[in-house]
Regions:
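N-terminal helical capping/dimerization or prosegment-like subdomains
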Residues: 1-66, 232-236, 250-256, 262, ...
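Glycine-rich phosphate-binding loop signature in dinucleotide/nucleotide-binding domains
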Residues: 50, 140-144, 306
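Active-site metal-coordination/substrate-binding segment of hydrolases
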Residues: 55-117
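Hydrophobic/aromatic beta-strand patches that form the interior of the parallel beta-sheet core
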Residues: 55-57, 119, 149, 310-312
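Active-site metal-binding loops of divalent metal-dependent hydrolases
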Residues: 61, 124, 153, 179, ...
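Metal-dependent amide/peptide-bond hydrolase catalytic core
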Residues: 65, 160, 167-351
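Acidic/histidine-rich catalytic neighborhood of metal-dependent amide-processing enzymes
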Residues: 92, 96-167, 171, 351
């Protein structure tokens, strides 16, 4: 699997440009005798007894574009002192090849209590319409999944909940006038009332894993020149939604309390979680793995509603999107071994 990861690093796969890495993954599966189907740049394979509930093993093969600060070619896989350097090594190449290794380990087994679906998805880094969203829309409607494991760098600990995201474009309205006269209605002042509400409001329900819904005003714009009272003030609010609410519930509560016009850019990046008493979580706890709530987004947010899910994978999220990104070779080897054992332990608990 190390060689496969090196091939993936060496093949550019920026979001919406993942065709070449999709072909590599497809070829590896076909060479192992697995029937594969492509949906755009998503690669999907099924294994086990098709009549049984479905466990989804998913990770993404797209990457961000490299930023400044790299000391070598981001697409040249270099191993030094036990570290494999290269773009996508940590996010999320290691988790992807871990998922693939586990799928190949189990895919011919029909005696397991669950069947398997392996999905290497595109456009994760941009939450695109042609990644996990496409599979949810076009594939998992026909063949529903029952539980999902998303491969991301978590240090092989279990991220059992993930916040959703809404970005709100807000507009406070006023009436223009000359700043030298007592006229007009200043939209900037009107916006301050709502901005203060966003700063201080606390939602009633708290997630035991993710804590409170978090709202942050991140941008503001008003006025055209110094002597004109602004008739509109635009501001942006970043809302991180916990699994204690749906995105719609949070939006409706906001709309009840503020006077500004609100336009959500998207409602589809939903919070996600898995119950603490799920066999998958209990299996991890039995093995000594820890649980936590993740502040970062993944393809979990685009899964079908009500599908329990968690994130796990080798590597460290802090290394993602950084110059000289790397993954420990031993991290990868240990991760594959741990993940296969996690699935075996979960399956045993379900029998």
């Amino acid at each position: 699997m190390l060689e496969l990861l090196q091939r993936l690093i060496a093949t550019p796969s920026f979001s919406r440009e993942e065709g070449a890495t999709a072909e590599i993954i497809e070829d590896v599966l076909q060479e192992a005798g697995v029937k594969v189907k492509r949906y755009g740049n998503n690669v999907v394979a099924w294994g086990g007894d098709a009549s049984k509930p479905v466990l989804l093993l998913n990770s993404h093969h797209d990457t961000v574009r490299p930023g400044a600060g790299w000391t070598h070619d981001p697409h040249l896989p270099v191993t030094n002192d036990g570290k494999l350097f290269g773009l996508g090594s940590n996010d999320a190449g290691g988790a992807l090849v871990m998922m693939l290794a586990a799928f190949l380990h189990f895919h011919n087994r029909t005696d397991l209590p669950m069947s398997l679906c392996f999905a290497a998805t595109a456009e994760e880094e941009v939450s695109g319409e042609n990644g996990m969203a496409m599979l949810t829309r076009d594939v998992f409607v026909e063949r529903p999944i029952n539980v999902a494991i998303i491969g991301e760098p978590t240090g092989m600990q279990m991220a059992i909940a993930e916040k959703g995201l809404m970005v709100l474009d807000c507009v406070a309205r006023g009436r223009t006038g000359h700043a030298a006269r007592n006229e007009g209605v200043n939209a900037l002042y009107a916006s301050l009332i709502d901005i203060e509400w966003f700063r201080t409001h606390r939602f009633e329900r708290t997630s035991p894993v993710l804590g409170n819904v978090k709202m942050t005003v991140t941008q503001i714009e008003a006025g055209s020149q110094h002597n004109v009272v602004p008739d509109s003030c635009r501001f942006v609010v970043d809302v991180r939604v916990t699994d204690a609410y749906t995105n719609m519930e949070v939006l409706e509560e906001i709309q009840r309390h503020v006077a500004c016009e609100i336009t959500p850019r998207s409602m589809r990046l939903a919070p996600s979680s898995i119950p603490m008493d799920h066999p998958l979580v209990l299996a991890g706890i039995e093995m000594g793995l820890t649980t936590y709530g993740s502040p970062t987004m993944s393809d979990q947010s685009l899964l079908p509603p009500d599908v329990p899910s968690m994130k796990i994978g080798p590597g460290d999220s802090a290394r993602s999107h950084t110059p000289d990104e790397w993954l420990g070779v031993q991290e990868l080897e240990d991760g594959i071994e741990t993940f296969i054992r996690l699935l075996e332990t979960m399956m045993r608990r379900m029998v």
